[in-house]
Amino acid sequence: MLEKKALAERFYVNFGKMSRIGKQPIQIPDGVEVKINNNLIFVKGSKGELTQELHPEIKAEIKDKEILITLKHNKSFNFAIWGTFRALIANMIIGVSKGFEKRLVFEGVGFRVSVSGNKLVLNLGFSHPVEIEAPKGIGFKVEKNTITVSGPDKNLVGQIAANIRASKKPEPYKGKGIRYEDEVVRRKAGKKAATGTTTTV
């Protein structure tokens, strides 16, 4: 009984939080153009342009350099959608005006990474190099052993960075591979070392 009560309380706290997020207007900064056409929202800025289809329960309108997100039907199960779409549109504004970046670090003897046109070319000790093509709006930059993925779409930047990491995941013994810049890799001791010893990088 107590467990059900706790779950119910958590349910209403989370929905209350999401509804508070949804109510907050989104500022439109200078240099950003926003258009709403039926259930589509278009956002354009110096870093690119994005389009998002709105959920059927979500209404968006522009008023005094702000985007207002409201629910068409004020039902509790719509509150999560409300907060989610408000956060999504806010990220679109940030993306086209400032952009998003994700950095990765590669470690390994003989590893080489370069940019060729719109492709990231990774020589990671395999028989052939790994090539990752940049989707529209995504840019690659390589400096020393750091790879930077940039673009206006936060989710796409994160997905491409994840694909790069997956091409050679960091192994736990010598740390060789590709990791996120802020990632902590749990290091394991080799067979000759003491069992259970771990370090971090």
Residues covered by each model-derived region:
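N-terminal intrinsically disordered, cationic/polar leader segments
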Residues: 17-162, 166-201
